[in-house]
Amino acid sequence: MLEQFKNPDRIYKGTDFWMLNDELTDDEIRWQIREFKDKGMGGFIARTYVGLRTDYPGPKWKHQIRVMLEEATKVGLRVTLQPLRMPGGFKESTVEETLDIIECVSKEIFESEDYRQAEYSTILAEYDDHYIVVHKAGCLPDEETGIRYGGCLNMFDPEICRKYVQICYEDNWEEFREYFGNTIHTMWVDEPLVPMHAIPYP
């Protein structure tokens, strides 16, 4: 008992919340994982984060996840994979697959000539004298420009939701299935979550 207290199993040790950003390299990945082990960690969450320059969820990203899993297996750390959060979207999501704003608008305003968003909007529902409308992300008049930062998936579309599950879950299973149940402890995601800059309602 005393010996186990001095050197506990990895399930009793901490899990590092590893924010993966910038350009990942194989050597840096291996070094950081060895540092986790050296500092007494029992595992880590490999979390995609703001500033990531590697091609998530592309071939280079998958290669580097495999490097992580190989090194973690070698040193005895447990890994938690994190797909991109839902409904925040995924790197390949298109303007057509995302929502920008969901809004309740009076019919009088929506049907007036001054309501500029009408031509970029779809009416989702009608209640008495109001519409529930969605404005598509990235739709601006020709003379205006703006920055599109993320957005959220159109969860009203089953096909888009299935695409998210395919890219973020099923593809990971197919690619790394030999590690699930041993090195890969679980998959974690803070879903559902819409980032504050992309809340789809006023």
Segments the model singles out, each with a brief description of its role:
Residues 1-12, 27:
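N-terminal carbohydrate-binding accessory modules
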Residues 9-13, 23, 40-51:
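Conserved, charged catalytic cores of large soluble enzymes
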Residues 185-202:
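Carboxylate/His-rich catalytic cores and anion/metal-binding grooves
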Residues 10-12, 40-42, 73-79, 181-185:
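Short, well-ordered coil/turn segments that N-cap beta-strands
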Residues 18, 36, 72, 187:
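Conserved, mostly hydrophobic/aromatic
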Residues 6-8, 33-40:
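Acidic (Asp/Glu)-rich catalytic clusters
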Residues 47-166, 177:
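Acidic/aromatic-lined carbohydrate-recognition and catalytic surfaces
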Residues 23-36, 165, 169-176:
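Short, acidic/polar
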